[in-house]
């Protein structure tokens, strides 16, 4: 991420990706004003579980972010249709939980034809909605399980939206067990 961009991890865990983003951006600061800008609303996160939420706050504080903006709660609990331009960000870095299932109430936040219990696909939809659009589109680096973009049904419908609307740059597939 570049200085002046807003970075989000919607499932930040203990904040590792956000700490690295902050450290990377801090190296770009050359003036007091730039450091102040970095401290104010540049690094954002959400975490559903209480202990990782507290650890993320502490992790960012220990690495120099004076007022971490980590929100407690599940990022998926906001209906996608309510996410507008003001909620969009420049960069999303995340390793969302996958393999689990979300409670039924969460599914109603997603379009009917894309509702699934597979958490990775829900987070992928959220990420697509939270990224800034043209003229300066946002970027994301997301860890997802093998094959999530190669499934059929809901996965195929999400991919049909992803490919024409976003520039899918790279897919790195790791061998099983890595």
Predicted regions and their residues:
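A generic alpha-to-beta junction signature in SAM-dependent methyltransferases
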Residues: 1, 131-135
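Conserved S-adenosyl-L-methionine
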Residues: 1-91, 99-101, 117, 121, 167-176, ...
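Short beta-alpha connecting loops at secondary-structure transitions
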Residues: 40-44, 107-112, 173-174
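Glycine-rich S-adenosyl-L-methionine
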Residues: 109-132
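Conserved beta-strand signature within the Rossmann-like core of class I S-adenosyl-L-methionine
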Residues: 136-144
């Amino acid at each position: 991420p570049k200085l002046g961009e807003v970075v989000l991890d919607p499932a930040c865990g203990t904040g590792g990706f956000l700490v690295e983003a902050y450290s990377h951006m801090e190296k770009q600061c050359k003036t007091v004003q730039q450091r102040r800008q970095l401290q104010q609303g540049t690094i954002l996160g959400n975490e559903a579980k209480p202990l990782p939420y507290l650890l993320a706050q502490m992790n960012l504080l220990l690495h120099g972010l004076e007022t971490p903006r980590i929100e407690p709660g599940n990022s998926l609990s906001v209906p996608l249709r309510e996410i507008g331009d003001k909620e969009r960000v420049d960069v999303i870095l995340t390793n969302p939980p996958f393999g689990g299932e979300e409670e039924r109430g969460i599914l109603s936040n997603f379009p009917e034809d894309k509702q699934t219990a597979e958490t990775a696909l829900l987070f992928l939809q959220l990420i697509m909605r939270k990224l800034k659009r043209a003229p300066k589109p946002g970027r994301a680096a997301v860890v997802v399980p093998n094959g999530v973009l190669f499934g059929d049904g809901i996965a195929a419908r999400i991919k049909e939206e992803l490919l024409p609307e976003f520039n899918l740059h790279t897919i790195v597939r790791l061998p099983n067990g890595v």
